[in-house]
Curated annotation (Swiss-Prot):
Its EC number is 6.3.2.6. One of its GO terms (biological process) is 'de novo' IMP biosynthetic process. Belongs to the SAICAR synthetase family. Keywords: ATP-binding, Ligase, Nucleotide-binding, Purine biosynthesis. It comes from Ralstonia nicotianae (strain ATCC BAA-1114 / GMI1000) (Ralstonia solanacearum). It catalyses: 5-amino-1-(5-phospho-D-ribosyl)imidazole-4-carboxylate + L-aspartate + ATP = (2S)-2-[5-amino-1-(5-phospho-beta-D-ribosyl)imidazole-4-carboxamido]succinate + ADP + phosphate + 2 H(+). The keyword Ligase applies. This is Phosphoribosylaminoimidazole-succinocarboxamide synthase.
Length: 302
């Protein structure tokens, strides 16, 4: 395994902020250097141990999807090599895991698209017959494919806080009906096209989330990450079965361990600090991320 990067320390550029996984540095007034670390968050809590290669896998996966889907919506890419904007001694921190992007005005709505009933969506449906306020037919089962993908937005929370599911009406109220409809329609189109491609690779994309910003002309632009194992639930099609929790190529593996772990006989309350992950869980999770990259894109880690 390669060495892991838990936190970057690039002193040649002003640090703007550290998110759960990514760290942003200013490159002039109109660009950012976005570094994807090997940190992992689960249940909106940042875990204390890095997952080796995870950041590089996510960066390569995003790059693959940005190139594949840019005909649908502009992306934040600039094409500038990250090594070109840092000092030579800092190049190892950015190589393969960073991207120089346009500085956008972020839209504080997580654009979640669900094509299958899974995770919190399944729990919501069991309790209410709806997912995030979207009424669904009765009698659906866990992991069942929905007749059409649904848009279930969330309000973006601060680091350490839980994202809050909100209705489409609330999105319209916050950002206006025209932009809300554009984000919904673009998100569903991105999901459908990515799902169709993933199906040819033997992967089901159960759900995913996108983030958008506006450029200086007010143009909607895809930003942050796209269809990675962090922002999506990937299932191998060959072992998919309705009524079960399909095995997945994402951090669900860690989530399941955290759900099962007991601390002094009690479940972990899903607040910081997170329990220490065993070495085998870290290794298996790193393998899952690498496998997702290869299965989906046909590429190996660069």
């Amino acid at each position: 395994m390669s060495s892991a990067l838990y936190e970057s320390s690039i002193t040649s550029l002003p640090l703007l902020g550290r998110g759960k996984v990514r760290e942003n540095y200013a490159v002039g007034d109109d660009k950012l250097l976005m570094v994807t670390t090997d940190r992992l968050s689960a249940f909106d809590v940042i875990l204390g141990q890095p997952i080796p290669d995870k950041g590089r896998v996510l960066a390569q996966m995003s790059d693959f999807w940005f190139r594949k889907l840019r005909h649908i919506v502009p992306t934040h890419e600039t094409g500038i090599a990250p090594e070109a904007v840092v000092q030579p001694g800092e190049a190892d921190q950015v190589r393969g895991r960073a991207i120089v992007v346009k500085r956008l005005k972020p839209i504080l709505v997580e654009a979640v698209v669900r094509g299958y009933l899974a995770g919190s969506g399944w729990k919501d449906y069991q309790a209410t017959g709806k997912v995030c306020g979207v009424q669904l037919a009765p009698g659906l089962r866990n992991a069942e494919k929905l007749p059409e993908p649904i848009f279930t937005p969330a309000a973006k929370a601060d680091v350490g806080e839980h994202d809050e599911n909100i209705s489409f009406d609330e999105v319209e109220r916050r950002i206006g009906p025209e932009l809300a409809a554009q984000i919904r329609d673009v998100s569903i189109r991105l999901y459908k096209e990515a799902s169709d491609f993933a199906a040819t690779r033997g992967i089901i994309i159960a759900d995913t989330k996108f983030e958008f910003g506006l450029d200086e002309n007010g143009t909607l632009t895809l930003m942050d990450e796209a269809l990675t194992a962090d922002s999506s639930r990937f299932w191998p099609a060959d072992s998919y079965q309705v009524g079960t929790n399909p095995p997945s190529f994402d951090k669900q593996f860690v989530r399941d361990w955290l759900e099962a772990v007991r601390i002094d006989g009690q479940p972990w309350p899903k607040t910081a600090p997170a329990p220490q992950l065993p070495a085998d869980i870290i290794e298996k999770t790193a393998d899952k991320y690498r496998e997702a990259l290869t299965r989906l894109t046909g590429e190996t880690l660069r």
